[in-house]
Regions:
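Noncatalytic scaffold domains of N-terminal-nucleophile
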Residues: 25-46, 50, 58-59, 63-233, ...
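Positively charged n-region of N-terminal signal peptides that target proteins for export
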Residues: 1-6
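Bacterial N-terminal signal peptides
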Residues: 7-19
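Internal maturation/activation junctions in enzymes
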Residues: 298-316
C-alpha cells in the first residue's frame, strides 16, 4: 500500500535538517536532500535548522522551535498554552503526544453561565480573561518528547537557550505580528500586564521595530536552571497562581502540579490507496480529516474542471 503520513507539530512541520524558505520568495517548490524545517516565523525556523546542524534530530528541533515561537509568535506559540505533536521514528513507528491545556479542578459545567443561566460574554467567559485560561501543557509536552524521542545529543537547557536569547536580545517585528497585535488591541489594552508588554509608549510595536521581552527571558532562564518542574512547581508556578488569585482566576498550584502530558495512538484511515495517519482525540483534526477524505472518495475529482464551482464546493 502506498503511504501518505500527515504529521502535526505545534504549528511546525519538521523532517530532518535543511534550509528555510522566505515567505517573500517566489512560489517555487523548496527542495532539500536531508529534510527541512517550517514554521510560521522564519527566525524560529532557523533555530530548528541550527539545532539539527549541531547534531539534534527532528524532535530536538521541534522543541527548540516551539520555545522560539513562544517569543516570536505570541498569538499562538506560547508557554501558557498547549498543543499536539505527531512523530514518526526511523523504524517506521508513529506516535502522538497530547499536551493540550486541561481545565482547572475548580471549573464546572456552569462556570461560564451567569446567575440567570445565560452565557457570559467577554470578561469571565470562556474566551477572555483569567477564568478562560486552562492549565498549560507546553512545557510538560516538550519534556515528554525530549525524554522519549530526543537525540540525547542536546540538553534541555541547550534547546531552551535560543528562545531565552531571542526574548532577551529581541527580534524584528514582522508584518504579521504587528497586524495580529493591533487586531487584538481591545483585549491587550484591557489588562495592565499585556498593555505593558505589547505596547511601547502607548502604541503597538510596528513592523521592523525591535521587540524585547525580559520577563519571558527570565522565565526561560529559570527553566534552564531548574528544568521543566520549575514551571509547574517552582517560582514560575507561584507567579502564575498569585496572578490568578489577584484576578479571580481558577487555576491553583495543585492544578499545575497535577498536569500530565500523554502519549496516544494515532488515528488511521485510507484515501485512494494511501494510508492517512493523524492526531487522535482530544484533537478533532485527525478524525475529521479522514472523514472528509472518505467522503471525497465518492467523487471522481479528475473529471471536474480545475476551477469549477462543483470542485470548489467539494473541496471546501
Amino acid at each position: 500500500m502506498r503511504r501518505l503520513r500527515l504529521y502535526l507539530l505545534p504549528i511546525l512541520l519538521i523532517v530532518l535538517n535543511a534550509p528555510v524558505a522566505s515567505l517573500a520568495a517566489a512560489r517555487e517548490p523548496v527542495r532539500a536532500r536531508h529534510g527541512m524545517v517550517a514554521s510560521t516565523n522564519e527566525v524560529a525556523s532557523r533555530v530548528g535548522v541550527d539545532v539539527m546542524k549541531r547534531g539534534g534530530n527532528a524532535v530536538d528541533a521541534a522543541i527548540a522551535v516551539a520555545f522560539a515561537l513562544a517569543v516570536t509568535h505570541p498569538v499562538a506559540g506560547n508557554l501558557g498554552g498547549g498543543g499536539f505533536m505527531m512523530i514518526r521514528l526511523k523504524n517506521g513507528k508513529t506516535t502522538a503526544i497530547d499536551y493540550r491545556e486541561m481545565a482547572p479542578a475548580a471549573a464546572h459545567r456552569n462556570v461560564y453561565l451567569d446567575k440567570n443561566g445565560s452565557l457570559i460574554e467577554g470578561e469571565g467567559g470562556s474566551l477572555v480573561g483569567y477564568r478562560a485560561a486552562g492549565v498549560p501543557g507546553t512545557v510538560r509536552g516538550m519534556e515528554l518528547a525530549l525524554k522519549k524521542y530526543g537525540s540525547g545529543k542536546l540538553t534541555w537547557a541547550q534547546l531552551v537557550e535560543p528562545a531565552r536569547r531571542l526574548a532577551a536580545d529581541g527580534f524584528s517585528v514582522t508584518y504579521s505580528l504587528a497586524r495580529s497585535l493591533h487586531g487584538s488591541r481591545e483585549y491587550l489594552e484591557k489588562y495592565a500586564e499585556t498593555k505593558r508588554i505589547y505596547l511601547k509608549g502607548g502604541n503597538f510595536y510596528k513592523e521592523g521595530e525591535l521587540f524585547r521581552q525580559p520577563e519571558l527571558a527570565a522565565t526561560f532562564a529559570r527553566l534552564q536552571r531548574s528544568g521543566p518542574n520549575e514551571f509547574y512547581e517552582g517560582e514560575t508556578a507561584r507567579l502564575i497562581v498569585a496572578d490568578m488569585k489577584r484576578n479571580n482566576g481558577l487555576m491553583t498550584m495543585d492544578d499545575l502540579r497535577g498536569y500530565v502530558a500523554k502519549e496516544r495512538t494515532p488515528v488511521r484511515g485510507n484515501y485512494r490507496g494511501y494510508e492517512i495517519i493523524s492526531m487522535p482525540p482530544p484533537s478533532s483534526g485527525g478524525a475529521v480529516l479522514i472523514q472528509m477524505l472518505n467522503i471525497l472518495e465518492g467523487f471522481d475529482l479528475q473529471k471536474l474542471e480545475a476551477n469549477s464551482s462543483v470542485r470548489y464546493h467539494l473541496m471546501a
